[in-house]
């Protein structure tokens, strides 16, 4: 009667290693579920999908029930079928209850972890679907808007080009007629006469002591101050091919007018310099020819 409990003890001892290996495998499964590929999670959050991601997810979902089916028979410890005495049965049951409770607790924890993992995955999938729908709507709306905006811009520029072409055609005959008679305003004549007189004065009195360009710069500063006291004539803006090209390229007309005004002022200063320098050289040559003793 005594050797029978020893057999049951041997059966329990042989069952404990199999229980430990099953718990290790279960823990490994939980760890794999928790430590999913970080790159896949980031792709799900950001909304990027690889072409093979769907197949991988299906394979993972298929492998999960297979692993659970494999682990279920391994998780049940081996219990001896021979029942001899009530004491031995009670002993076997009492020996088995702790391992069964641990398995139940482990299964509950695994279910909680699975639900905790699946919830963010579902929310991320819903967010990805919403993002994809929003992106699809945006692209569908932006495509006709972009084409419509481009068509309007093209038509507006075409109309501007036609207007500028007509303006150029109308200005060409008037420019050809007015080439011989160029109108000079009073301030322009005053500037040219002043530059010529300054050149004579500099050659006669200041040439030996100062630079010939210092008085010219002083005269230009005086012209800048006296400009507002002279009546301003109406300046006709001449439309050229360059201004037409600038307008068609999208540059505002105000910027073009300002730049043209700046260039016209620079041209006026250059004209004054040419008159001043030519008059100075002419006077110098005349004085050298008629009076060599004159300094």
Curated annotation (Swiss-Prot):
**One Pfam family for this entry, by name?**
Get2_like
Coarse class of the primary localization is endoplasmic reticulum
- The UniProt regions of compositional bias labelled Basic and acidic residues, in chain numbering, are 127-138
Output one GO MF annotation: cell adhesion molecule binding
Entry comment describing in which tissues the protein is expressed: In the central nervous system, expressed in astrocytes, microglia and neurons (at protein level).
Positions in the Cytoplasmic compartment: 1-188, 228-268
As for subcellular location, the record says: Endoplasmic reticulum membrane
Coiled-coil ranges (or none): none
Keyword field:
Disulfide bond, Endoplasmic reticulum, ER-Golgi transport, Membrane, Phosphoprotein, Transmembrane, Transmembrane helix, Transport
User: Where would one find the signal peptide in this protein?
Assistant: none
Polar residues bias: where?
Answer: 15-24
Domain of life, per the record? Answer: Eukaryota
A single Gene Ontology biological process assigned to it is: B cell homeostasis
Q: Which cysteines are joined by disulfide bonds?
A: 207-283
Modified positions (Phosphoserine) are 53
What does this chain do? Required for the post-translational delivery of tail-anchored (TA) proteins to the endoplasmic reticulum. Together with GET1/WRB, acts as a membrane receptor for soluble GET3/TRC40, which recognizes and selectively binds the transmembrane domain of TA proteins in the cytosol. Required for the stability of GET1. Stimulates calcium signaling in T cells through its involvement in elevation of intracellular calcium. Essential for the survival of peripheral follicular B cells.
**How does this polypeptide assemble, per the annotation?**
Component of the Golgi to ER traffic (GET) complex, which is composed of GET1/WRB, CAMLG/GET2 and GET3/TRC40. Within the complex, GET1 and CAMLG form a heterotetramer which is stabilized by phosphatidylinositol binding and which binds to the GET3 homodimer. Interacts (via C-terminus) with GET1. Interacts (via N-terminus) with GET3. GET3 shows a higher affinity for CAMLG than for GET1. Interacts (via N-terminus) with TNFRSF13B/TACI (via C-terminus).
| PANTHER family linked to this entry | CALCIUM-SIGNAL MODULATING CYCLOPHILIN LIGAND CAML, GUIDED ENTRY OF TAIL-ANCHORED PROTEINS FACTOR CAMLG
Name this protein carries in UniProt: Guided entry of tail-anchored proteins factor CAMLG
Q: Origin organism of this chain?
A: Rattus norvegicus (Rat)
The UniProt gene name for this protein comes to Camlg
């Amino acid at each position: 009667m005594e050797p029978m409990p020893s057999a049951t003890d041997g059966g329990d001892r042989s069952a404990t290693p199999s229980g430990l290996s099953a718990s290790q495998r279960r823990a490994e499964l939980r760890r794999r579920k928790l430590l999913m590929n970080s790159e896949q999670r980031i792709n799900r959050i950001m909304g990027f999908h690889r072409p093979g991601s769907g197949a991988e997810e299906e394979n993972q979902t298929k492998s999960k029930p297979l692993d659970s089916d494999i682990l279920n028979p391994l998780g049940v410890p081996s219990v001896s079928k021979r029942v001899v005495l009530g004491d031995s049965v009670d002993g076997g049951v009492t020996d088995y209850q702790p391992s069964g409770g641990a398995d139940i607790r482990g299964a509950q924890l695994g279910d909680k972890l699975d639900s905790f993992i699946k919830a963010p995955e579902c929310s991320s999938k819903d967010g990805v679907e919403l993002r994809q729908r929003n992106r699809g709507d945006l692209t569908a709306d932006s495509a006709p808007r972009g084409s419509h905006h481009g068509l309007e811009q093209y038509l507006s520029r075409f109309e501007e080009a036609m207007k500028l072409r007509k303006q150029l055609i109308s200005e060409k005959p008037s420019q050809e007629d007015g080439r011989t008679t160029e109108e000079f305003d009073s301030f322009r004549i005053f500037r040219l006469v002043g530059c010529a007189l300054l050149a004579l004065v500099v050659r006669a009195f200041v040439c030996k002591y100062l630079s010939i360009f210092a008085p010219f710069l002083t005269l230009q500063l005086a012209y800048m101050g006296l400009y507002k006291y002279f009546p301003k004539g109406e300046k006709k803006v001449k439309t050229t091919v360059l201004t037409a090209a600038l307008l068609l390229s999208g540059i505002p007309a105000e910027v073009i007018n300002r730049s043209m005004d700046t260039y016209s002022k620079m041209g006026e200063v250059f004209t004054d310099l040419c008159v001043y320098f030519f008059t100075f050289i002419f006077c110098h040559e005349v004085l050298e020819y008629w009076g060599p003793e004159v300094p």
